[in-house]
Amino acid sequence: MMKKPVVIGLAVVVLAAVVAGGYWWYQSRQDNGLTLYGNVDIRTVNLSFRVGGRVESLAVDEGDAIKAGQVLGELDHNPYEIALMQAKAGVSVAQAQYDLMLAGYRDEEIAQAAAAVKQAQAAYDYAQNFYNRQQGLWKSRTISANDLENARSSRDQAQATLKSAQDKLRQYRSGNREQDIAQAKASLEQAQAQLAQAELNLQDSTLIAPSDGTLLTRAVEPGTVLNEGGTVFTVSLTRPVWVRAYVDERNLDQAQPGRKVLLYTDGRPNKPYHGQIGFVSPTAEFTPKTVETPDLRTDLVYRLRIVVTDADDALRQGMPVTVQFGDEAGHE
């Protein structure tokens, strides 16, 4: 009969030990697990045309989901198409001029220049002889000083024409100067740059979505004349999804880049999202008011960016999130 109370006593002791051990294990797990509070990062971007013009069409409205590469709107293309045609013509002219400079002068052009020199030489010889005769007549007082001056002027003009023809023939025979060829090449490159700019302007008269997102606001309507850079849409970026949280200096060593964490929301308290710390701010700041940790309000903390690896549409920007550290986060 004495054995029964002993057995019961042993059972009670064992049960108490199990309960105490379980409580100790639970407490140790809780103490080792760091909990932070943050929000799904709000990331928006203002979309605009890089060039100005009249809005021709807009393909999306507020609330629409957009995909990267999707056409969102277009300006009137006509002014940019005309500018492109002008730029192409400018390249053609500059290319032809450059090719002429490289090719040099033809034999026919050299022969014509030589003939021009011969003709200019004859004209100069005649003018020089005439001036010489006029000098003799002026000395004998047969002509006036004005007549002599006219003869001298004709001689000087014929001499200038001869020199110009000789210089031209010399240039034709030696080919174009390197400086002239370089100038023609520079003109061609300038025309090509203007063509590239015209092509880019035409391309930028179509507004393309840079990434996936949701359209928050549509600031203009078709027919609006915009200056370059004027906001057309405001888009909320949906990928990747980031959580912004803050950690105090005491726990900073636990929040290392690459560390895996669990993310809980009020709508999914029993089914966490998975995340990985991607960035830890190198500078401290005071805890923002949006962080729901009253005991840390006046503490200096470090901002974390946590990338959600299994995000879905249920995670909305600005949503409060609980960040759980611990062994279970690192092994799931």
UniProtKB/Swiss-Prot annotation:
Domain of life: Bacteria
Cellular compartments per GO CC: periplasmic space
Localization of this protein: Periplasm
Alphabetical UniProt keywords: Coiled coil, Periplasm, Signal
Annotated signal peptide: 1-16
Family: Belongs to the UPF0194 family.
Protein name as it appears in the record: UPF0194 membrane protein YbhG
Species annotation: Escherichia coli (strain UTI89 / UPEC)
Lineage, top ranks: Bacteria, Pseudomonadati, Pseudomonadota, Gammaproteobacteria, Enterobacterales
Gene: ybhG
